[in-house]
Design a protein with these regions (language model features):
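Accessory carbohydrate-recognition regions in carbohydrate-active enzymes
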Residues: 24-417
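Bacterial N-terminal signal peptides that target proteins for export
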Residues: 1-9
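C-terminal motif of bacterial Sec signal peptides marking the signal peptidase cleavage site
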Residues: 17-18
């Protein structure tokens, strides 16, 4: 009852915030310059470091230094650590208890395990130098030293973009490690990956996070993807982690992986667009088509920067030192990053019982609101709900609607996965 009372109070705050007039800013400031995503990344949580994302997005991309280790209890520090010197891949999804769709470009002999930080040569991970790494809201890049491959990441709300610039090699690869434990996602219960045609890969992974085991035994979290390649691979292999390569284009089961093989020229660029969804492969495809079918990497990068500047300019501070502005806007950036979309462009969303719900559509065919399912009312403990209501009322409206629809579906969450 107290939770429901707090929710009603929140709705009242929303009404006040929505009715409040906002004085338009004549010209937006370039506030992304004050956001330093690498601050606080030593011993940080899985969902903390996702520079290649837009505010409140589903697609949250970043580098992982030990995400493939998994997470024994569901809350330990894992993912990206500023003190680490090698990278084990670039996941597309980072949320509380959710991690999936890891990609890694390599050159040379294919290795079928990620390897450890202490012994990077045993796996497909690569060393990197901090001087070759760059992170800003909406974009990330790094040079993988062991392969001399430059990796760039950006995103729209539901689509991840990965760009690889390869050296000249007749043994360039893109490893898609789909069916293995990643970050806080827990053990994999099922996975599937298939080459649909020369330029399309699709699949899913179903995980059982540790917190789900504790609080809703038997439930699982599925993640679906639909990826388009800018260039077709010369050949494709599949395998289960640690096993020999097989000359097939489809594989199912925990541990499933796919390797795309290329013969690359010097500075050859290969782009991937990865549509994401919590409901189905079909909706992952639809999300890609609606948000990014005709969008280039550079266009997506520019749009992401614009979205971040728009969001950060909701609160403009003056005076103080540059260090203080960096602290403020980096904190605001994290307040807008960690609560992600769960619904698709057509209004489909994952219900607590494992079925698929449908948000009512407006006359133009778009959903009446977006569904968000991360952290739920925990945000109230950190005063995030007040921040959203005052500065981001359109998001707060969707957030409240998300809590209400979960209540109507049978739960009013303290946490939602």
């Amino acid at each position: 009852m107290n939770i429901f009372k707090n929710l009603c109070i929140g709705i009242g705050v929303l009404c006040l915030a929505s009715c409040a007039s906002r004085t338009p800013v004549a010209q937006e400031m370039e506030l992304t310059q004050y956001v330093h995503p690498n601050i606080g990344t030593v011993h940080s949580r899985w969902f903390f470091y996702t520079p290649a994302a837009v505010p409140f997005g589903m697609a949250k991309l970043g580098a992982s230094t030990n995400g493939t280790y998994g997470n024994e209890q569901g809350w330990e520090a894992v993912g990206y650590d500023e003190t680490h010197t090698s990278i084990d891949g670039f996941p597309c999804m980072h949320e509380f208890q959710i991690g999936g769709i890891l990609l890694m470009p390599t050159v040379g002999t294919v290795k079928n395990i990620p390897g450890k930080l202490e012994t990077p040569d045993e796996g497909y991970r690569s060393r990197f130098d901090k001087k070759d790494e760059y992170a800003t809201p909406g974009y990330y890049s790094v040079l993988l030293k062991d392969y001399q491959v430059k990796v760039e990441l950006t995103a729209t709300e539901r689509v991840g973009f990965q760009r690889y610039t390869f050296p000249k090699s007749d043994s360039s690869h893109v490893i898609m490690d789909i069916g293995n434990k990643l970050g806080e996602s827990g053990n994999v219960r099922d996975a599937y990956i298939k080459q649909v045609d020369e330029s399309t890969i699709e699949g899913y992974v179903v995980t059982e996070p540790e917190y789900v085991k504790k609080y809703q035994a038997g439930a699982t979290v599925p993640m679906y993807f639909y990826a388009k390649l800018s260039q077709s691979p010369n050949s494709v292999n599949v395998l289960f982690r640690g096993k020999d390569l097989m000359e097939k284009t489809e594989i199912k089961g925990a541990g499933a992986m796919m390797v795309l093989n290329y013969d690359t020229s010097k500075d050859q660029v290969i782009d991937l667009k990865i549509g994401l969804s919590y409901t189905s492969i079909e909706n992952a495809k639809l999300n890609l088509e609606k948000e990014a079918e005709n969008l280039s990497f550079d266009e997506a990068k520019a749009l992401a920067k614009e979205k971040w500047n728009d969001a950060l300019n909701r609160i403009v501070v003056s005076g103080g030192t540059e260090e203080s502005r960096i602290k403020f806007y980096t904190g605001l950036y994290h307040a807008l990053l960690g609560r992600g979309l769960a619904s698709d462009v057509n209004g489909a969303y994952p219900k607590n019982d494992g079925s698929i719900g449908q948000i009512k559509l407006k006359q133009d065919g778009t959903p009446e609101y977006n569904h968000y399912n991360t952290d739920a009312i925990w945000g109230g403990y950190w005063n995030l709900t007040n921040l959203w209501a005052i500065a981001y009322p359109e998001y707060y409206n969707d957030w409240v609607q998300s809590q209400v629809i979960m209540y109507k579906d049978g739960k009013l969450p303290k946490l939602a996965y």
